[in-house]
């Protein structure tokens, strides 16, 4: 599982700027979840081989007792509880405050790994103006400038170094997956019906479930079998033990959702027909796409809406989730057990598509046929020339195309190629990534 880093500190010390640096973005992939918009933002980043999740929090006053400040304190405490390491941000220019002392006292009491960061330290003599922060009792002070990117790499080295992370395993992209269980995550916002659907499945299959071994950061996974196909159901709804089996309860955790999506082979994205497509649905869908996971859409509570509402909902899905056009969509009622059979078929089909093997001769033939049908547009004196294609990975499938001047290939032409490949290999329910590798000889592709 990806380690989780929480940024805490009093208001206006530069946490959000640092967050944007750590995620290399001005808007995290998963941000502004409903009910958390002013308090917690979630994003992801990478340092070398290690990926991580970052939580940005509102200004923290541990002892706040009323109003918005109490809610912000509660949200920050939740972020700290979710985190593996805390980055405590102070303002190097304004110096230490009573609030900093209160936050440090709270963090010392928790005993969680912590990195003390003095932001806005650009142009300051190192060590001279930061001495007072040693009084906080959290060890060395790391000067950084989030605005200029100074010290950010050192910050990540310190934060991740405290966790003794193992080297990420190099997965064989062509490992035989036929005999492995399909890892399935049911994702969706709170009260969309995840727990009802999971409990329906568990009840149907009369499962004996158990915790899989792993670290405390691991999501619970429940192994089960259906029609001869083995699955592992990865928890996002909050599975609790009931005797020798699990039942699901509604318990929404952004971090758990992100980690469960990362751990999955296939994500079943559940949408509430009575609520329509919300911003939160779109954010989760965006994270699924960015993670490269196979995905199936299921619109739950379909029996609770009339024909007009159904038409409007279908249009909304086509518009707001247009980037998931490749995903099969089902209309179900988890409570009444309607539409669940075809849903299983699509889950298996999506996994098959995500892990299919595409021979180089077939890919190259398809590429040549596509080029013959529609030649890439010429840009200036250069025209992209495509030579051959091969598979570069699975789950999601990656097709690598080699040639000359491929940097001039338009996004529209890439979509054209994607459509041809999808049709040939029946790639339903999975993202498809196309990588272009061009010759570095600037004269190789000039039109004479």
Curated annotation (Swiss-Prot):
GTP 2 binds at residues 188-195, 235-239, 300-303. GTP 1 binds at residues 9-16, 56-60, 119-122. InterPro entries: G_ENGA, GTP-bd, GTPase_Der, KH_dom-like, KH_dom-like_a/b, P-loop_NTPase, Small_GTP-bd. One of its GO terms (molecular function) is ribosome binding. Associates with the 50S ribosomal subunit. GTPase that plays an essential role in the late steps of ribosome biogenesis. NCBIfam families: GTPase_EngA, small_GTP. This is GTPase Der. It comes from Delftia acidovorans (strain DSM 14801 / SPH-1). The gene is der.
